[in-house]
């Protein structure tokens, strides 16, 4: 069997974290460099040739536009390299779903791209990072992973970027998918896909822009005042995602303020603060010019809205059509 040539882009996170004790709860993410990490991986005897590149070595709470741009550039270059069969990105778990979704929207599907992380630091009892990484190698080495968009591998399961979400603060089973759960099951020695690849086109869905428009998330809570929306927006704000109660609901005074913002040119998307469930369009959305997030949670709705606005798509109907396709 020919070994796959895979590029490993390291950004830090718990998978490269160290606690200094096998029993401590607190730890420092991003302490192990990619070269040292791949030395540990060599002992596993994986059937792949791995080339590492350090993009950052930080917790994923600090990952944003600059690192997204570097990742996009490196992966684009890897796609143009005929000797590279796939890309693995080691990443902290806190914002992995946002990085994965942004890359999924703006990269072609010609080669596998897999994000992988860990819930326990490298020196903890029951460290899950090496197994997750071995699983990621298995997925990224499989030609059938192409055409499925960007994937996230955690806890012996493979998730699509558009579905994956972190649902627990602790435990190796912290990730789940919605509306689809796992799209595959993986171990270091086996991989089973659920269904055929779903990305019909090999091209990127949208162009990547290094500078994304300002789009805050407004979290709705009991007793929220209408003035909150005005306080969190400025002249630079291009869109706003509402993490509403229930099916994206909000008090009427706040809704009236958001209508005013919409009339001033700010795109408004209604999502839900609940972990699962669809936010469908309602008759009032037509009158208000709002967009329903459908299956996307607030953080992913924000990423999609930023990408759409950066690509010049600002009409509510066109934005809704893009959300309907998710």
Regions found by a protein language model. Give the residues of each.
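A short helix->loop->beta-strand "cap" motif at the edges of active sites that frequently abuts
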Residues: 84, 109-112, 263-268
